[in-house]
Each structure stands twice: as structure tokens, then as C-alpha cells.
């Protein structure tokens, strides 16, 4: 069975993917006050979770930082990925455990996606891109070829990153930004062309 950690809107999208793949979800896990059912699926507290060795998990939380914190608590668990049937992935693409790929996303040859990443609706990850762990590429964002994205970074909706650019760890690329040069670790960049606006102060 599969459990989804986080009864959220993002969780509903993952639930839909798994339903389309005929992979049954046993329950959402959420310690906040939630209804007994969410998306037609039971919601349980983490202290009610008793995993069998074969049970699988996906952390269904959009925030990179929150996803990382949950992953630390659940270290040693069996994580699985979910890839929408109308996403387009080259046969040479690597998507690691815990990551999700939404409808309409395109991942081209030799792209690599780390653990617990989100490749959101309609995002494009072009040839030979490499994404670290806990990365979120938002809807309709475009990474051109040979882009590198460091752990815990977020590329927001509609942003474009030109070929060969490196985005550092914990960086944030604002919605609609056009990134023409490398982005340092922890930088928040916005605009066209993208420029540094502030610092992402989240520290692991």
C-alpha cells in the first residue's frame, strides 16, 4: 500500500496520479486538524501509522523545507515515485525515489531528478539537466539543456533558465523570471533578466 504524508492540494494531485496508475492509496497522514476523509481517502495521524515492510510513502507537501523535515523523520522508510501517464520522459531519464512528475511535464534525454523533487504540471526539463534533492520546478517552468539545480531550490511558475546555467542550493527563482546567468546558493532572483532581490534565509 501507499501512504501520502500531507493532506494538501498537492496531495490531491499526487492522489490523482496514483489513481490513474491503479496504485491504491491507503491513507493520508497529517497531524494538523483535518477531516476524517480527504479526497475520499482516510486521514490518520502519524502516531497511528504502522508501516509494513512493503508499504510505500510519498511526501505530498509542496514546501521544499517541510518535505525535507518530514523525510528526516521518516528516514529508513520505503519511498516511491509517481509519474503521471501523460508526462513525457525519455527512456534515459532518471527520477529518484520520492519524486513526482505531474501531467504534461517533459523530461528530455539524460535528465536526472533527485530524491523528493516535484516536477509540476507542464514543466520542461531539457536534455542533460541535473536536479538535486528536494527541488521544486513549478508549473510551466522551463529548464533549457544542461541546467544544474542545487538541493532545496525552487524554480517558480513560468520561469525560464537558459542553457548551461547553474542554480545553487536553497535558491529561489521567482515566477516568470528569465535566468541568463548562474544563481548563487541561497539567492532569490526575480525579473527579466533575473537579478538578485534578497536571500533565502531558510537554513537546514
List PLM regions with ranges:
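Phosphate-bearing ligand-interacting subdomains
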Residues: 33-90
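Short alpha-helical
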Residues: 9, 65-66, 178
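Small/polar loops that bind or transfer phosphate-bearing groups
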Residues: 6, 58-62, 163
Amino acid at each position: 500500500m501507499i501512504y501520502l504524508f500531507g493532506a494538501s492540494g498537492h496531495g490531491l494531485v499526487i492522489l490523482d496520479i496514483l489513481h490513474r496508475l491503479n496504485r491504491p492509496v491507503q491513507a493520508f497522514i497529517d497531524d494538523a486538524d483535518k477531516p476524517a476523509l480527504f479526497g475520499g481517502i482516510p486521514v490518520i495521524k502519524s502516531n497511528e501509522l504502522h508501516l509494513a515492510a512493503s508499504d510505500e510513502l510519498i511526501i505530498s507537501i509542496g514546501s521544499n523545507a517541510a518535505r525535507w523535515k518530514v523525510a528526516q523523520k521518516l528516514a529508513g522508510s520505503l519511498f516511491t515515485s509517481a509519474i503521471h501517464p501523460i508526462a513525457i520522459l525519455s527512456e534515459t531519464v532518471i527520477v529518484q525515489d520520492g519524486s513526482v512528475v505531474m501531467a504534461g511535464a517533459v523530461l528530455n534525454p539524460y535528465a536526472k531528478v533527485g530524491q523528493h523533487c516535484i516536477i509540476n504540471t507542464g514543466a520542461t526539463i531539457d536534455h542533460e539537466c541535473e536536479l538535486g534533492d528536494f527541488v521544486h520546478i513549478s508549473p510551466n517552468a522551463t529548464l533549457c539543456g544542461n541546467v544544474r539545480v542545487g538541493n532545496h531550490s525552487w524554480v517558480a511558475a513560468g520561469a525560464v533558465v537558459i542553457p548551461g546555467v547553474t542554480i545553487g542550493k536553497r535558491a529561489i527563482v521567482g515566477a516568470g523570471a528569465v535566468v541568463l546567468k548562474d544563481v548563487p546558493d541561497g539567492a532569490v532572483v526575480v525579473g527579466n533578466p533575473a537579478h538578485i532581490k534578497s536571500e533565502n534565509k531558510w537554513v537546514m
